[in-house]
Design a protein with these regions (language model features):
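Substrate-binding pocket helix/loop in short-chain dehydrogenase/reductase
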Residues: 86-87, 91-99, 199
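Active-site helix of classical SDR
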Residues: 110, 147, 155
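Alpha-helical segment proximal to the catalytic Tyr-Lys
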Residues: 115, 160-161, 227
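Residue(s) in the substrate-gating loop at a strand-loop-helix junction
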Residues: 130
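Short C-terminal tail/terminal secondary-structure segment
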Residues: 135, 219, 230-243
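Short, small/polar-rich loop/turn modules that mediate ligand/substrate recognition or access, typified
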Residues: 163, 168, 229-231
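Short, flexible catalytic-loop segment of classical short-chain dehydrogenase/reductase
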Residues: 174-184
């Protein structure tokens, strides 16, 4: 308990899944949390933290958050979008949205809060990427892989540029994780049971991960326990990428 006592943390994509689990764990560990999401109804069910409905695709709104929120110690960029299809079937809209949310929104959030971290003498940035794109290629996930690979590059670039300012930047790369988003994608296949079985089959541990397991890694990277870690892309994938 109290591993984040005295720290202010901001989490995007906070209404459900990994983001929500991260908010709840951070609160239990003593952090003051600001939770952001575009889903107002789900966000409103979070208790014990400050919530704000924000469209991260609106650059003007994101740029203004620094003044509104103030200095933070921890930034978790968890908001994301999963687009399906290979290169030839991917539509321009899905490709652009993948970059707008998976890369550009994270970049703007970092750009907004980084000066405050530098002035304070340090901070921790945690980007939620994926093994898809950042570590391996995954079929029918072209835009997702390309954008999450770019997020890995963003992570390392920020880490190397600001390490001497005491700012750490790392990325979590999950495998398949149970979440409302996963359920929606499974349902969209037309045979959710078969799709789930296929996802489980590619995990050597024989199961899908939980949002709470990913949140536990986010907690470690947000805390001072990981003070010697920066620029790392950490797989948490049930052994998917170990071969």
């Amino acid at each position: 308990m109290n591993r984040l006592a005295g720290k202010r943390a901001l989490v995007t994509g906070a209404a459900q899944g990994i983001g929500r689990a991260t908010v709840e764990l951070f609160l239990r560990e003593g952090a003051e949390v600001i939770a952001l999401d575009v889903q107002a109804e789900a966000l409103a069910t979070l208790a014990g933290c400050r919530t704000k409905v924000v469209d991260l695709l609106d650059a003007v709104v994101v740029d203004a958050l620094g003044t509104e929120v103030g200095t933070i110690d921890v930034l978790v960029n968890c908001a994301g979008y999963v687009d399906a299809g290979d290169l030839l079937s991917t539509e321009e809209r899905g490709y652009r949205l993948s970059f707008d949310l998976n890369v550009d929104a994270a970049m703007r959030m970092i750009r907004t809060f980084l000066p405050g971290m530098i002035a304070a003498g340090g901070g921790s940035i945690v980007n939620v990427a994926s093994v898809a794109g950042a570590m391996i290629g995954v079929p029918e996930r072209f835009a997702y892989c390309v954008s999450k690979g770019a997020l890995g590059g963003l992570t390392r670039s920020v880490a190397v540029d600001y390490v001497r300012h005491g700012v750490r930047c790392n990325a979590i790369c999950p495998g398949t994780v149970q979440s409302p988003s996963l359920d929606q994608r499974l349902a969209a296949t037309g045979d959710a049971e078969a799709a789930r079985a296929a996802f489980i089959a590619r995990q050597p541990m024989g199961r899908i991960g939980t949002a709470e397991e990913i949140a536990a890694l986010a907690l470690y990277l947000a805390s001072d326990e990981s003070s010697y870690i920066t620029g790392s892309l950490m797989a948490i994938d049930g052994g998917w990428t170990m071969a």
